[in-house]
Amino acid sequence: FFFSSRRRHTRYWRDWSSDVCSSDLELPTGKMKSREGTVVDADDLIDEMVSIAATHTQELGKVKDFAETELKELYSTIGIGALKFFLLRVDPKKKMIFNPEESIDFHGFTGPFIQYTHARIKSVLRKNEINVGSKIMNEPLHKMEKELLVHCELFEQTLFQAGQSHDPSTLSMYLFQLAQMFNSFYAALSISNAESEEKKQLRLKISSLVATILKSGMQLLGINVPEKM
């Protein structure tokens, strides 16, 4: 459903960028306005974000098996994604204080957290093959499986609400909650070593659905998600 819903609701996203840009933006040191002498050059801010992304990624040991060119692209994707998501997660009617360090927290309400969740799912899917012809199970769903599927079903409704209200923070929160739910699901229930092949296939398909929604939603926010991190 998410592919058609994205096409159907894209028109609602044409004008919200102007609403976001009209909100007050501050750094921890003060407002980003030239009349107060604290204007921040966009290129400098982006460079800083990419640098912070590189530092955090290296500290977490997430740079193995990457070529140098791939690392540069990854740092840029994380840094710019963190900046965009931090700005878009706030109600456009409210004042926001942008903290570069906070925006690249891999465990918080941030773009990198969602990007990492997507990459984690893609890693699982690379190691396990989905049998597209497998039948739907008759046994009851685990509570976490059901909760994830229910939240996935809310994607179309969330797109409509966010587009109608010109408020991308609605979508940002939805994606964050979905990523949180998946990580709880991933920690509690085995996918690769599920209790049966049927359960394994079910969880792989749920994981694939979550990854697709995360990628689609982030792209609507103008943010790329890496295939691996």
Q: How should each PLM-predicted stretch be described?
A:
Residues 1-21:
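Single conserved hydrophobic/aromatic residue that forms the stacking wall/gate
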Residues 18-229:
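Non-catalytic interaction-recognition regions
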